[in-house]
């Protein structure tokens, strides 16, 4: 019988010898790369690597794409950060755009600047940062309100303080005189909503306590009577309100107390108002009626109605 030929035993090339072989191959590759370069080329490459420097470059203003992005409501990135009360993000944006007045004073579809929104969302620290960065406090929204108008309407004393303290004197006097599209000054709005502390502050800063509404001539004192607010009446009198100032129809604040429930207001104003401004003036309608009566006379044969019918029968007068 034939026997199968024995196969030669195969020895696995594993272990230390295999690792040495791989290292030797890698060394050969590195050596071959170095050997292919001349000494002058190698020195030049090292020199160039040593001369490489990374220098930060300032990105030119206006090239930031996030400044150009607007929502369908016309809100910029800064508007949105303020609306969502992301204070850290808002402060960082303000820091980056400081001095960029076009971006800081950009108005959305409701003509609101970031400063308007900071007041609306009751964030006085953001309002202060915006003013410091260059935001204009005199810009108006679609209702003609400056940021100070909104702060007075909302009764936020902190925002009022920031806006009045951060404004220069000419700016402040201009804002205090400004009326919105309803004819109201900041003092009028504070009076209408009964914020006595803000009223006192505005008057101390130079607001005209006797400023009249353009539409009908009411002063803050007239408004206080209309609202039946005796505490506001007392404060305005203390601040120098003129009790004898009349509206464009000729009514003094005291005359507006007739038919109103507060006797306290009537007593306060009655002691100070001129006597001829205490009685209600005769209306034009009554005068015209009296005038017509004088000239309208009928004889016995000329009655104003001669065709009266009752139950189908004509009445004989």
Curated annotation (Swiss-Prot):
The modification Phosphotyrosine is found at residue 42. Changing residue 32 to T: Decrease in phosphorylation and degradation. Residues 1-39 are annotated as: Disordered. GO terms for biological process: B cell receptor signaling pathway; canonical NF-kappaB signal transduction; cellular response to cold; interleukin-1-mediated signaling pathway; lipopolysaccharide-mediated signaling pathway; negative regulation of canonical NF-kappaB signal transduction; negative regulation of cholesterol transport; negative regulation of cytokine production involved in inflammatory response. A motif (Nuclear export signal) lies at residues 45-54. InterPro entries: Ankyrin_rpt (IPR002110), Ankyrin_rpt-contain_sf (IPR036770), NF-kappa-B_inhibitor (IPR051070). Phosphorylated at Ser-32 and Ser-36 by IKKA/CHUK and IKKB/IKBKB; disables inhibition of NF-kappa-B DNA-binding activity. Phosphorylation at positions 32 and 36 is prerequisite to recognition by the SCF(FBXW11) and SCF(BTRC) complexes, leading to polyubiquitination and subsequent degradation. Phosphorylated at Ser-32 in response to FK506 treatment: phosphorylation is independent of IKKA/CHUK and IKKB/IKBKB and promotes NFKBIA degradation, followed by NF-kappa-B activation. Phosphorylated at Tyr-42: its effect is however unclear. The keyword Ubl conjugation applies. Changing residue 36 to T: Decrease in phosphorylation and degradation. Changing residue 47 to R: Little change in Tax-stimulated transactivation. No change in Tax-stimulated transactivation. The modification Phosphothreonine is found at residues 291, 299. Changing residue 38 to R: No change in Tax-stimulated transactivation. No change in Tax-stimulated transactivation. Inhibits the activity of dimeric NF-kappa-B/REL complexes by trapping REL (RELA/p65 and NFKB1/p50) dimers in the cytoplasm by masking their nuclear localization signals. On cellular stimulation by immune and pro-inflammatory responses, becomes phosphorylated promoting ubiquitination and degradation, enabling the dimeric RELA to translocate to the nucleus and activate transcription. Belongs to the NF-kappa-B inhibitor family. It is linked to Ectodermal dysplasia and immunodeficiency 2: A form of ectoderma dysplasia, a heterogeneous group of disorders due to abnormal development of two or more ectodermal structures. This form of ectodermal dysplasia is associated with decreased production of pro-inflammatory cytokines and certain interferons, rendering patients susceptible to infection. EDAID2 inheritance is autosomal dominant. This is NF-kappa-B inhibitor alpha.
């Amino acid at each position: 019988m034939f026997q199968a030929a024995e196969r030669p035993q195969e020895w696995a090339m594993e272990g230390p010898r295999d690792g040495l072989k791989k290292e030797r191959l890698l060394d050969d590759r590195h050596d071959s790369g170095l050997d292919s370069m001349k000494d002058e080329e190698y020195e030049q490459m090292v020199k160039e690597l040593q001369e490489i420097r990374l220098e930060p470059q300032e990105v030119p203003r206006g090239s930031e794409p996030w400044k150009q992005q607007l929502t369908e409501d016309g809100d910029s990135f800064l508007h949105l950060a303020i609306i969502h009360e992301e204070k850290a993000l808002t402060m960082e944006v303000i820091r980056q755009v400081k001095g960029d007045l076009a971006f800081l004073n950009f108005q959305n579809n409701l003509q609101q600047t970031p400063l308007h929104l900071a007041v609306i969302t009751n964030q006085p620290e953001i309002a202060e940062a915006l003013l410091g960065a260059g935001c204009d406090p005199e810009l108006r929204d679609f209702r003609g309100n400056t940021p100070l108008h909104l702060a007075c309407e909302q009764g936020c004393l902190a925002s009022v303080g920031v806006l009045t303290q951060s404004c220069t004197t000419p700016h402040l006097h201009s804002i205090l005189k400004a009326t919105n599209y309803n004819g109201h000054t900041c003092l009028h709005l504070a009076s209408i909503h009964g914020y006595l502390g803000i009223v006192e502050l505005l008057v101390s800063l130079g607001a005209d306590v006797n400023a009249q509404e353009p539409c009908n001539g009411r002063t803050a004192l007239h408004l206080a009577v209309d609202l039946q607010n005796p505490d506001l009446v007392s404060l305005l009198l203390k601040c120098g309100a003129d009790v004898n100032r009349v509206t464009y129809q000729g009514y003094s604040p005291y005359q507006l107390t007739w038919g109103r429930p507060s006797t306290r207001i009537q007593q306060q104003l009655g002691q100070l108002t001129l006597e001829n401004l205490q009685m209600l003036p005769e209306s034009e309608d009554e005068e015209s009626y009296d005038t017509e009566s004088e000239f309208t006379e009928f004889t016995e044969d000329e009655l104003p109605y001669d065709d009266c019918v009752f139950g189908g029968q004509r009445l004989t007068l």
